[in-house]
Curated annotation (Swiss-Prot):
Protein name per its UniProtKB record: Phosphatidylinositol N-acetylglucosaminyltransferase subunit Q
Gene that encodes the chain: PIGQ
Key words, A-Z: Disease variant, Epilepsy, GPI-anchor biosynthesis, Membrane, Transmembrane, Transmembrane helix
Lineage of the species this protein comes from: Eukaryota, Metazoa, Chordata, Craniata, Vertebrata
Subunit (UniProt): Component of the glycosylphosphatidylinositol-N-acetylglucosaminyltransferase (GPI-GnT) complex composed at least by PIGA, PIGC, PIGH, PIGP, PIGQ, PIGY and DPM2. Interacts with PIGA, PIGH and PIGC.
Natural source organism: Homo sapiens (Human)
Membrane-spanning ranges: 278-298, 349-371, 378-400, 446-468, 475-497
Pathway(s) it belongs to: Glycolipid biosynthesis; glycosylphosphatidylinositol-anchor biosynthesis
Family assignment from sequence similarity: Belongs to the PIGQ family.
Residue span of region Disordered: 696-748
Entry annotated with the keyword Cell inner membrane: no
Length: 760
């Protein structure tokens, strides 16, 4: 039997000692957690293991011995290591040995009890698998440590080999913390053995941050209570608070600080990641704000900005005056209503004159305003950007007024024209029913309405032109403010901590693998297929998992096959038989369908037409075009593999569904055919000729672009290698090619059908 031993990479170079870990009998694997070094007192070791078992609910024990020497272990050391098995009895007893500076490992697993079967070896083969203990513990590959009783039982029963490793390492944190600050009576080596000084500093920082966070949380709660006072909810203050971007950003930053200095512990890793991202975002914001503050107060840049701000405002006002004078003439050669054009132009020019006077009155205070705005950058760059957005809104307030005037005037014109157009057509708007109804008007009403409609229609181009110009100016200001708000939102929501982990430590963002989740009650648990030979001295990637990690394409293919099986109903007049022994509740629909893979050659007609099969789909497998077909229930008869399937090669028509002149004789020689029954039904056979305790399989051979594999493909193991097949009795070997044109080296392609699932 092959045993799997998961060994931490942090213990590869440690001194000799005992292997402390957990034995998983369901997976025949041992998870090594730490190395216990000499010298030690056995009673203290047993007390430590008992405390760890009680705190973590993990069966931690001494699994074996670890020998790390400069050369082969001496005879006395070997006898001493063997004698430790009597002090710490465990079955099996692991013995791992490595030469210092070498790459050769010696791995043994012995049983002190007598072998159960005669001739069985007393030692098992060991497959050594290295894992990074720190990465496994810091990642989210393990299951939650706190689960309800009902979920904990189901989770423990469904965990596979890798999930058991993740769960064991995660729940054994008590063992890793036993010697964080000092070595103690027992000296262990694990992932935290070399970080005692860092652990002490981290513990001191954690204890010092508790009172500080409590004090800051109290101050923030006081500020929140003051801001929620009813005085700030009165009309002027509430209106200004909802319109100013600075107030919104300060409120948002207060929520962030409350979350950061909260003394409540994070319930799950998602909340912890959110809190860490918030801390990183606030630190980045404050750092950028301090950089802006130092830049503004250096070399009297605030005075230069104040001196340049008033001339810029005057220049903008002059450009607006030139634009209005251009509109009061003949803009772009358009004929405007001169009276209305002059009224609107002078109205807007008067507002610009008022705005220039207001700017000149505020010019002595601009430098002081900018100085206080620069001080606000110590709260963060986002606060300074929000203040800049509010300043832009105040400096362009006249443009906003122009846009509102033009929009209201244009809206009145449009509504008036729509009402007069309904009057002109003899219609009216019914306010109660919210619809347009017919209405009879007098002659004077029609005359006045038609006259007003004509006047408004001729005045519409002038109003529309002013509305269009001021709308474009307003859009320009809104675009600038939108860019500023976009930058503020980017700084507030930037997951800087997650990005740093993704670049530096991507294992911290890993989640539980979906392949290790339960597949359902009707499906067997995933199994690991291991090569029969020993893996000592071989690289770990040679241990090929079978059935535990399926590709996405295989998962989708299995889902499609299950959907097709679900649409196959039992035939009329037959009752559903009871479950046969060894089939694990095999469904009736699966017993009513037989699947096969057939080739589609380039120079002829495929053989599935001759056999009357229903094509399900086609795909490319191993560089060979293949089609998946279904044989209906009336074709499901007792079958056996034969080298030929048609009389063109076999000399007799043993299969009535294959014609005499097969269009593709070479392909027919590659197919395991279905033969009519030649014996009566006996006990142990289902009504459709499926032998109980066996799995259905059809093999197809054909050319392969890669190197031909061994006689038995690793994806088609025998019943002894794959216990989930329900007791497979038939040996799935490639069928001989038979006569016909020569083909390249045959390559076995198998479709295996197990109870409750279909696996390629």
């Amino acid at each position: 039997m092959v045993l799997k031993a998961f060994f931490p990479t942090c213990c590869v170079s440690t001194d000799s000692g005992l292997l402390v870990g957990r034995w998983v009998p369901e997976q025949s694997s041992a998870v090594v957690l730490a190395v216990l070094h000499f010298p030690f007192i056995p009673i203290q070791v047993k007390q430590l293991l008992a405390q760890v078992r009680q705190a973590s609910q993990v069966g931690v024990a001494v699994l074996g011995t670890w020998c790390h020497c400069r050369q082969e272990p001496e005879e006395s050391l070997g006898r001493f290591l063997e004698s430790l098995g009597a002090v710490f009895p465990h079955e099996p007893w692991l013995r791992l040995c490595r030469e210092r500076g070498g790459t050769f490992w010696s791995c043994e697993a012995t049983h002190r009890q007598a072998p159960t079967a005669p001739g069985a070896p007393g030692e098992d083969q060991v497959m050594l698998i290295f894992y990074d203990q720190r990465q496994v513990l810091l990642s989210q590959l393990h299951l939650p440590t706190v689960l309800p009783d009902r979920q904990a039982g189901a989770t423990t029963a469904s965990t596979g080999g890798l999930a058991a490793v993740f769960d064991t390492v995660a729940r054994s944190e008590v063992l890793f913390r036993s010697d964080r600050f000092d070595e103690g009576p027992v000296r262990l080596s694990h992932w935290q053995s070399e970080g005692v000084e860092a652990s002490i500093l981290a513990e001191l920082a954690r204890r010092a941050s508790g009172p500080i966070c409590l004090l800051l949380a109290s101050l923030l709660s006081l500020v929140s209570a003051v801001s929620a006072c009813r005085v700030f909810k009165l009309w002027p203050l509430s209106f200004l608070g909802s319109k100013l971007s600075t107030c919104e950003q300060l409120r948002h930053r207060l929520e962030h600080l409350t979350l950061i200095f909260s003394t409540r512990k994070a319930e799950n890793p998602a909340q912890l990641m959110r809190k860490a991202n918030t801390v990183a975002s606030v630190l980045l914001d404050v750092a950028l704000g301090l950089m802006l503050l130092s830049w503004l107060h250096g070399r009297s840049r605030i005075g230069h900005l104040a001196d340049a701000l008033v001339p810029v405002a005057d220049h903008v006002a002059e450009e607006l005056q030139h634009l209005l004078q251009w509109l009061m003439g003949a803009p772009a050669g358009l004929k405007m209503n001169r009276a209305l054009d002059q009224v609107l132009g002078r109205f807007f020019l008067y507002h610009i004159h008022l705005w220039i006077s207001y700017i000149h009155l505020m010019s002595p205070f601009v430098e002081h305003i900018l100085w206080h705005v620069g001080l606000s950058a110590c709260l963060g760059l986002t606060v300074a950007l929000s203040l800049l957005s509010d300043i832009i809104a105040l400096l362009t307030f006249h443009i906003y007024c122009f846009y509102v005037y033009g929009a209201r005037l244009y809206c009145l014109k449009i509504h008036g024209l729509s009402s007069l157009w309904r009057l002109f057509r003899g219609k009216k708007w019914n306010v109660l029913r919210q619809r347009v109804d017919s209405c009879s008007y007098d002659l004077d009403q029609l005359f006045i309405g038609t006259l007003l409609f004509t006047i408004l229609l001729f005045l519409l181009p002038t109003t529309a032109l002013y509305y269009l110009v001021f709308t474009l100016l307003r859009l320009l200001v809104v675009a600038v403010q939108g860019l500023i708000h976009l930058l503020v939102d980017l700084i507030n929501s930037l997951p800087l901590y997650s990005l740093g982990l993704r670049l530096c430590r991507p294992y911290r963002l890993a989640d539980k693998p979906t392949a290790l989740q339960p597949r359902g009650a009707h499906l067997p648990p995933p199994q690991l297929w291991l090569p029969p030979q020993a893996l000592l001295g071989r690289p770990v990637p040679q241990a090929v998992p079978w059935g535990a990690h399926l590709p996405l394409e295989a998962e989708r293919g299995q889902a499609g096959l299950r959907e097709l099986l679900a649409r196959l109903a039992p035939p009329h007049g037959h009752s559903q038989p009871s479950a046969l022994p060894g089939w694990h509740q095999l469904s009736w629909r699966m017993s009513c369908a037989l699947w096969t893979l057939l080739c589609a050659p380039e120079h002829g007609r495929p053989c599935y037409h001759t056999l009357g099969l229903e094509v399900i789909g086609s795909e490319q497998m191993w560089g060979w075009p293949a089609r998946l077909a279904a044989l209906h229930h009336w074709h499901c008869l007792p079958w056996d593999p034969l080298p030929t399937c048609c009389g063109h090669h076999g000399g007799e028509h043993s299969n009535p569904r294959c014609p005499e002149h097969c269009p593709m004789p070479t392909l027919c020689t590659q197919v395991q055919r279905v033969r009519p029954p030649q014996q009566p039904q006996v006990e142990g056979w289902s009504p459709w000729g499926l032998p109980s305790g066996s799995a259905l399989a059809v093999g197809v051979e054909g050319p392969c672009q890669d190197e031909p594999p061994s006689p038995r493909h690793p994806l088609a193991p025998s019943a002894e290698q794959h216990p989930a097949s329900g007791g497979l009795k038939q040996s799935l070997t490639p069928v001989p090619s038979g006569p016909g044109p020569s083909l390249p080296e045959p390559h076995g392609v198998y479709l295996r059908m197990f109870p409750g699932e279909v696996a390629l």
